Structures are given as C-alpha cells and as structure tokens.
Amino acid sequence: MDEVKYPVLTEKSIRLLERNQYTFNVDSQSNKTKIKNWIENFFDVKVIAMNSYRLPEKGGKRVSMIGHPIRCKRVIITLRTGDSIPLFSEQ
C-alpha cells in the first residue's frame, strides 16, 4: 500500500461519488499504471478512467532552499457501473 496513501473526502470528492468517481492521494513518484493495478487488485473493481494531478505547493518562508518540495499526487478514478469501493459506501 505504498502507492495509495489515503482517500480524500472534500466537497468535490463527495460530489464525485454520485458519478462513481473516487479520489485518493497517492505517492508523488507513482504512475497511473501502478495505481490502477493496485486499486483493481486490492478492491476487486474495474477502473475505466483515471485523472491525476499534483497538488499545488504550500506557500511560506523558505530560507536557503532552492526549488519547492514535491507534495503528493491526487488521482480521481472512475469505476465501471455496479462497482464500488467499500470505504466510501453509505451505511
């Protein structure tokens, strides 16, 4: 579970649940193929689409630091109709 860090619960991600789309923060070095394979094997679902983006850097003071720290990457996955991830299911 090094690839996927944790699920994201924001207003946008909750709205996307209605369209069978789930949001996760993942390791910044992971690629889409690794993430897709991990999610399909771990949750036993079929991923039909995936979008990823890097989170913007945090502002603040940086003393003698060149560049900026790489934060995690966020992915939005779309599952086929009928599949769901139990972490997000309503009870």
UniProtKB/Swiss-Prot annotation:
Pfam families: Ribosomal_L23. InterPro entries: Nucleotide-bd_a/b_plait_sf, Ribosomal_uL23-like, Ribosomal_uL23/eL15/eS24_sf. One of its GO terms (biological process) is translation. Its main location: plastid. It is found in: Plastid, Chloroplast. GO terms for cellular component: chloroplast; ribonucleoprotein complex; ribosome. The keyword Oxidoreductase does not apply. Keywords: Chloroplast, Plastid, Ribonucleoprotein, Ribosomal protein, RNA-binding, rRNA-binding. One of its GO terms (molecular function) is structural constituent of ribosome. Part of the 50S ribosomal subunit. Binds to 23S rRNA. Belongs to the universal ribosomal protein uL23 family. HAMAP family: Ribosomal_uL23_B. PANTHER family: 60S RIBOSOMAL PROTEIN L23A. This is Large ribosomal subunit protein uL23c. The lineage of its organism: Eukaryota, Viridiplantae, Streptophyta, Embryophyta, Tracheophyta. The gene is rpl23.
